[in-house]
Amino acid sequence: MEGACASTYRSVSIKTKNKLNAAALVSGKGHQDENFPVASFLINPEYRPIIMAFYQFARQADDVADNVIASKKDRLAILEDMRSSLTGESQSEPNAVVLRQTLITHGLDHTIVHGLDLLEAFRRDVSVNRYENWDALMDYCRYSASPVGRFVLDVHKESRNLWPMNDALCTALQVINHLQDCGKDYRMMNRIYIPSDIMEAVGATAGDLGRFHASLPLRQAIETAALKTKSLLKRSSGFSAAIHDKRLGVEVAVIQRLAESLTECLTKHDPLSERVHHNKAETLGLAFVAAAGRLFS
């Protein structure tokens, strides 16, 4: 999950019944700041508020997990409050309560499980800062990435037969984010998502991530992870065409194309010394090509 500098967190202490509340740990980051579209104008307006309620819940839980000021104990306690509020056992966390009520109102209470899966990932973010191998990272992504796409598919009443392709794309997006932010995640939170065995195989060390230019071994480790990500994107290449809802299909096509381009960039550029992102013009160009391909396929 993407980190944030401690100074960007609100210093105000918001408490509920003398206990730290998630609202005290907000980063101020919104859906416009994410690396990929979140409920963009392409999504059916009927579904957009539901997806945004899920996003607000996930964003707040992510902020809690990534906060570098609150103690581990406090962060885990807040995440537990979010869980109990989502399941209806309590009402201590407003964003979780709003999400639960939104889902029940729209007959989507069966999708609450996706929020619970996300909370498992955020608990791991608090407690785990290294991943031994690719399989361990993929297991983490099963909770941190796949539930987001699965939720969107369920909201659109798409077939769960699409889940394998969804999981591949969502996992690829998560790994891309990890590689883009690998230096920041290490410096600010002592977190390394590049699997240890990949780094060890090429002689890269944790200290390499603390520099402002990637060493040759670290560049090799990043390239290895990026190549594995390309394999995930091959598995998701038919995803957008298989989606029944045309608007969602276009959005997924755009995301797939952006992910493919960013993965290629990560094999050629140093995320420690430069920002490996697309500017607005590049994003619009890629989006146009992807959208046209989906609409006229």
Swiss-Prot record:
| Keyword Signal annotated | no
Alphabetically sorted, this entry's keywords are:
Lyase
State a single Gene Ontology molecular function: lyase activity
Report the catalytic activity. presqualene diphosphate + H2O = hydroxysqualene + diphosphate
Record keywords: Translocase included?
Answer: no
| InterPro entries, per the entry | HSQ_synthase_HpnC, Isoprenoid_synthase_dom_sf, Squ/phyt_synthse, Trans_IPPS_HH
Q: Pfam families attached here? A: SQS_PSY
Any one GO BP annotation for this protein? terpenoid biosynthetic process
Enzyme Commission identifier(s): 4.2.3.156
What pathway annotation does it carry?
Secondary metabolite biosynthesis; hopanoid biosynthesis
According to the UniProt record, what class of enzyme is this?
lyase
Q: What does this protein do?
A: Involved in the biosynthesis of the hopanoid precursor squalene (SQ) from farnesyl diphosphate (FPP). Catalyzes the second step, the conversion of presqualene diphosphate (PSPP) to hydroxysqualene (HSQ).
Q: Which family does it belong to?
A: Belongs to the phytoene/squalene synthase family. HpnC subfamily.
Listed PANTHER family: BIFUNCTIONAL LYCOPENE CYCLASE/PHYTOENE SYNTHASE
What is this protein called in UniProt?
Hydroxysqualene synthase
The organism of origin for this protein: Zymomonas mobilis subsp. mobilis (strain ATCC 31821 / ZM4 / CP4)
Give the gene name: hpnC
